[in-house]
Amino acid sequence: MRRMNIAAMAAIIGLGLSACGQQQTAEQEAAPAPAPASTVTVFQGATLIPGDGRAPIENGVLIIDGDTIVSAAAAGTVEIPEGATVIDIPGRTIMPAIYDTHVHLSADRAGVVNDLIRRAVFGVGAAQSMGRDSDELIATRSDLVPGGARYFSAGRGISRSEPGRPEGPFWIESVEEGVEAVQHLASVDVDVIKVWVDDRNGTVEKVTPEMYGAIIETAHELGVRVEAHIFNEEDAKGLLRAGLDIFAHGIRDKDIDDETEALFLANPNIILSANLPDSGYPTDLSFLEGIVPADTLAAAQAENVEDADTQETFGIQARNLDRLHNAGVTVTLGTDGNTPWAPHLELE
């Protein structure tokens, strides 16, 4: 068993790189080849969050063989393979990679690649872009980014016309146009179809029940789930009755009533991606020090202030989320933006 701490590993890597530049002697060239190194790496001493419903494991041992996790258990309950590289990380926490189900990535491939790499730094293993991605961009989903998160996409999405915006989602003004948009999105194999239903604070017309009913029905016929951007409770009720699969936001205009909870529970496969807004209370961002540029952190801190109006908005959504979660509704994480560390604030 080879035991290393992180500092020692860095030193050895540095020495190894230095040695690579030295010319081998005839004696070294004649030496027998060394035995193959073990492919097993062990991280021990950290708290492990298994992600399968079990409680966190204190003083855990995580055993990885190549690119496969073979064991996650408490110290003393599992045997460390002979020849394994052991890395001691007491005081750390290891958890499964995060799947951020609601992001808005850059508009071009180079930007998306950068976005995915930045997310991996913060433990995000997959990110789903929720609308406005071009057909050309979503065609690159299978092009994995080394060291980056996986990329999923809703494509362009569907909305009523938005004045002043020349491009973006499929603009629809009829049931027929909604159906055509779904057929196109399904043809490019989007991961989910997004529809913006609400009026965006009175700036656009709503997608009508007839429109979103046809969108949901057509998408289901084509084997694609539908996710809706909503604001108020009445729209949520209509979408639940129409068979919606996923909410891209929680209900934000009021505390939900018993009928809404009953409609959620009558749809056992419904998913709520809550996307809680800023809480309106200052947040500890010290974990970003040394990870993001100082000016980026300073800008984030400048906006990190107490705000009573934001607290009220947050309170409505937090209460609704808590009620539906306690009732048994499936909740997923989403952050609705392009901030790579945002999932950690959302989890908190």
List each language-model region with its residue ranges:
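Bacterial N-terminal signal peptides that target proteins for export
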Residues: 1-9
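C-terminal motif of bacterial Sec signal peptides marking the signal peptidase cleavage site
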Residues: 16-19
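Bacterial signal peptide processing site
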Residues: 21-23
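Histidine-rich, glycine-flanked metal-binding segment
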Residues: 33-34, 48, 52-95
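Histidine-centered divalent metal-coordination motifs
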Residues: 45, 92, 98-106, 229, ...
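Divalent-metal coordination cores built from histidine and acidic residues
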Residues: 89, 93-101, 111-226, 259-300
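His/Asp/Glu-enriched, well-ordered alpha-helical/loop segment
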Residues: 221, 313-348
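Glycine-enriched alpha-helix->loop->beta-strand junction motifs that scaffold or abut catalytic
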Residues: 240-247, 266-271, 328-330
